[in-house]
Amino acid sequence: MKVCIISILGRPNVGKSSLLNKIIKYDLAIVSNVPQTTRDQIMGVYTEDGYQFVFVDTPGIHKPLNLLGESLNKEAFSSLKDIDCVLFLSPVNEDIKSGDKLILERITNAKNKIAVISKIDLAKSPDEIAKKIDGLKEYGFNKIISVSNKNDKSVDSLIEILKEYAYNAPPFYDEDYITDKSMRFMAKEYIRESAINLLTDELPHSIAVEVQDFIEEDDRITINAIIYVKKDSQKGILIGKGASMIKKIGTNARMKMSHQFDTKVTLNLKVKVSNKWINDKSALKKFGYN
């Protein structure tokens, strides 16, 4: 077996989670158009044709405005320990920004690093892709490639390139192993994903989810969870008129869990206010953001 441990880095909302899901062919990392959707370091394992790649998806690196932001950056940079290759993602339609430069400084001495130009379906012309490639050349990447999550061939090309950095070693995990995250963790994330994709403005950044009970039975899983917000006004928005919004959130999350877990799911949601959770160390620890 040939193996390689790969860290996926980039600013918020550059396509890291979408790429991981496409590679491992499983909705592991939640996806939305809201920056900083990923809050945890998530490991996804690809095993095929005598190769095993362990991918580490990270929170988007940004200038932190609170303790949660500091925790997310710390989580992202911790992924650089004991890795064999770095994938640095940057969208084709965006210039290199201060957040990118922060990451590029941290990976200056990485032995193997690949620049991945993401969202190439948004490119207006081949010249735009060429300009992006030129802008990345000064940072010492081993390779610069472009990827579209809508194009399987471009993802296959990335896998072929990564094989160049794999080495002979016993596999880290069994062939059917996908992630180190538990079903309980995934339930929390699917609830948060459902809420994020239905809510607007700053509210998605203000929510946290706690799974209180995760009960596995022969024919179903029963989940009791709490969605926390920072303000009473946000609680009203999250619940909605006649509980319409919380019902939508619950229905969407339950349907995804039932599909991903391959069993019936009963989901019970409550909404509570925790005014300062985003800047409270004990609250962050409670929600899994150490």
From Swiss-Prot:
Residues 57-60 are annotated as: G3. Residues 199-275 form the KH type-2 domain. Residues 36-40 are annotated as: G2. It is a peripheral membrane protein. Pfam families: KH_2, MMR_HSR1. One of its GO terms (molecular function) is ribosomal small subunit binding. Residues 10-17 are annotated as: G1. SUPFAM superfamilies: P-loop containing nucleoside triphosphate hydrolases, Prokaryotic type KH domain (KH-domain type II). It comes from the Bacteria. GTP binds at residues 10-17, 57-61, 118-121. Monomer. Belongs to the TRAFAC class TrmE-Era-EngA-EngB-Septin-like GTPase superfamily. Era GTPase family. An essential GTPase that binds both GDP and GTP, with rapid nucleotide exchange. Plays a role in 16S rRNA processing and 30S ribosomal subunit biogenesis and possibly also in cell cycle regulation and energy metabolism. This is GTPase Era. The lineage of its organism: Bacteria, Bacillati, Mycoplasmatota, Mycoplasmoidales, Metamycoplasmataceae.
